[in-house]
Amino acid sequence: MRVSVVEVASSWRDLREVTGRAEHYRAELAVLGASKGIQFRWHDSRVSAMELAESDALLLLVLSGGTEQLGLSVIARWNGPVAILAHPADNALAAAMEILALARSVGHAGIIVQGSRGWRDEISLAITLAKTYSSLRRAVIGSLGSRDIEIMAPWALQGAVREVWGPQLVHLPLGELVRYSREADAHAAQEIASEMQAAAERIIEPDANAMLGSARIYLGLRRIVQEYRLDAV
């Protein structure tokens, strides 16, 4: 898990004081990264969109007030939700609240964590959520078959799923599953059916032929997943 941490602080603040705050958070996040397997990448507000795109999540570290423009300019280069860690003093929290409010007004999602007791746990949770978001954005899900009357056209459904949920939706004809199931290796299908029967405490129905048919369908689905490089179907 790679996380870009971007520090923002007002140029009117004492440099040594701001540097001391930054070093404190760097040390604390290093401990968190070591315990959770998170790789933190540190940047200043001049970080490019290309550099940010190499990470899975964005953590904006607000070290003082007077950082609204800097923070918003960073978020504008990022495609995804943002976690904002606000120093507990020097108007940093007020700046963080304004940054998030303005970012939300143009479609960005995010949360604020104040740098007080327990903040590392909150940041860890925020990063876990960001990882889930990133995984969903990379996911490809297969949708098999169609109905005579569709509520939404396939292209519209693909767009809605992508926008709201994140994954790319791929529509596949049901006939492809039927063909792959028929072509499934008989020995492999029998092994899977036997495994399912052995794992069951009791079988009333289906019968052996139905179990074998289910195993063939499973092998057909697995072939579709492999050929189309799907994460789910």
Model-assigned labels for residue ranges:
Residues M1-A232:
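An N-terminal assembly and electron-transfer interface module characteristic of large anaerobic redox
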